């Protein structure tokens, strides 16, 4: 089985997909039909599966899949069939891949109509004007369909449209980021509950259940949590141990906002430097933010709570107007730490032997 680490780094996006199933004795027709059903959302156009005998005597299976819309997956086991795991590649030259598949097959099955790859976006100049030159839209459509990475996408644009690439690079980079977003790694808490055990007040346990551990119901809003107290008490460690979250310290950076996060953490940021504080504290949905080095965007498609952590010297409540304080208290559970309070239990030391 692939490791979770390799699975987190996997990404495939293309209209042409080449699959190789090693040591696979399955019937090509059955595999073809199963793959066709798997990729239904991307509108499959053609598939061919061929079985061949490997040098070691085992049966291998090769498949070429063509879809109308690019297959976009981040799960390396998406194409697993009956426990058989394939090697997944982008077929950059579908003509050569198909020829390779049909080299020495023992059994073959096809469905749909094969779509040969054009030899060049710009056509064959040796044919003069007899062949219509593709439009800019057609060339871009080909680039979008066949590019397999951000780097390849920008390289193809640079080759086909050098002037546009030089003068409008920021727009192409923006579209590249949309087509090939950064893969979100599987969340592993940087502060898992361990020894010494993390703990919290009973009143906060009552807040945790409906706001962190229960899913958001449509039409309902969560409640945020404000914790103020001294430094080095473990409150940040405790807050970060609860699950997948957006974490901001020193400043709020919307460019890295993760919609899959369960909650947000604002840690040690003065009240006056926290943009959209009302939206965060009020667990509001679908509000617009303005990243420092990016375009405005809508975030937080569902209500999620924010845990605000502050020290006594930067208590948010001391900086608020009466109206702001009223809103804050109505939308936030406020917890002021007691003297000597910690968010972890001290480690149990082994008994010392008497001398």
UniProtKB/Swiss-Prot annotation:
Q: What is the lineage of its organism?
A: Viruses, Monodnaviria, Shotokuvirae, Cressdnaviricota, Repensiviricetes
Q: Where is this motif: RCR-1?
A: 18-21
Answer whether the UniProt record assigns the keyword Signal to this protein.
no
User: GO molecular function: any one?
Assistant: metal ion binding
User: Assembly and interactions?
Assistant: Homooligomer. Rep binds to repeated DNA motifs (iterons). Forms the O-complex, which is a Rep-DNA complex involved in the initiation of RCR. Part of the C- and V-complexes which are RepA-Rep-DNA complexes involved in the c-sense and v-sense transcription.
Keyword annotations: ATP-binding, Covalent protein-DNA linkage, DNA replication, DNA-binding, Endonuclease, Helicase, Host nucleus, Hydrolase, Metal-binding, Multifunctional enzyme, Nuclease, Nucleotide-binding, Nucleotidyltransferase, Repressor, Transferase
Q: Where is the CRESS-DNA virus Rep endonuclease domain?
A: 11-114
Q: What is this protein called?
A: Replication-associated protein
UniProt motif RCR-3: location:
100-103
Q: How is the cofactor bound?
A: Divalent metal cations, possibly Mg(2+) or Mn(2+).
Q: What is its EC number?
A: 2.7.7.-, 3.1.21.-
Residue window of motif RCR-2: 60-62
Instruction: Tell me the protein family, please.
Output: Belongs to the geminiviridae Rep protein family.
List the GO biological process terms: DNA replication
Which species is the source of this protein? Maize streak virus genotype B (isolate Tas) (MSV)
Its domain description in UniProt is:
There are 3 rolling circle replication (RCR) motifs. RCR-2 is probably involved in metal coordination. RCR-3 is required for phosphodiester bond cleavage for initiation of RCR.
């Amino acid at each position: 089985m692939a490791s979770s680490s390799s699975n987190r780094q996997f990404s495939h996006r293309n209209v042409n997909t080449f699959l190789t199933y090693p040591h696979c004795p399955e019937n090509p027709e059955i595999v073809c039909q199963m793959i066709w059903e798997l990729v239904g959302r991307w509108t499959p156009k053609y598939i061919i599966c061929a079985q061949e005998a490997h040098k070691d005597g085992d049966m291998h299976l090769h498949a070429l899949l063509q879809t109308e819309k690019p297959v976009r997956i981040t799960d390396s086991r998406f194409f697993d069939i009956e426990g058989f795991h394939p090697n997944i590649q982008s077929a950059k030259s579908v003509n050569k891949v198909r020829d390779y598949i049909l080299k020495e097959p023992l059994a073959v099955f096809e469905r749909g109509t094969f779509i040969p790859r054009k030899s060049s976006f710009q056509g064959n100049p040796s044919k003069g004007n007899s062949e219509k030159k593709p439009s800019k839209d057609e060339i871009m459509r080909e680039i979008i369909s066949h590019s397999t990475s951000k780097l390849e996408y920008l390289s193809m644009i640079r080759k086909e449209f050098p002037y546009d690439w030089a003068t409008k690079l920021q727009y192409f980079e923006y579209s590249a980021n949309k087509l090939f977003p950064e893969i979100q790694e599987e969340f592993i808490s940087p502060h898992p509950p361990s020894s010494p055990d993390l703990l919290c007040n009973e009143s906060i346990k009552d807040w945790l259940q409906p706001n962190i551990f229960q899913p958001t119901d449509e039409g309902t809003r969560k409640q945020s949590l404000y914790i103020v107290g001294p430094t080095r008490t473990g409150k940040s460690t405790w807050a970060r141990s609860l699950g997948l979250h957006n974490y901001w310290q020193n400043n709020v950076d919307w460019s890295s906002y993760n919609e899959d996060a369960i909650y947000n953490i604002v840690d040690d940021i003065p009240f006056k430097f926290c943009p959209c504080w009302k939206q965060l504290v009020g667990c509001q949905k679908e509000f617009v933010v303005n990243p420092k080095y990016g375009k405005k965007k809508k975030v937080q498609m569902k209500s999620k709570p924010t845990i605000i952590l502050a020290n006594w010297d930067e208590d948010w409540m001391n900086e608020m107007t009466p109206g702001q304080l009223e809103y804050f208290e109505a939308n936030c559970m406020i917890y002021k730490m007691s003297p000597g309070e910690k968010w972890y239990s001290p480690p149990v030391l082994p008994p010392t032997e008497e001398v």
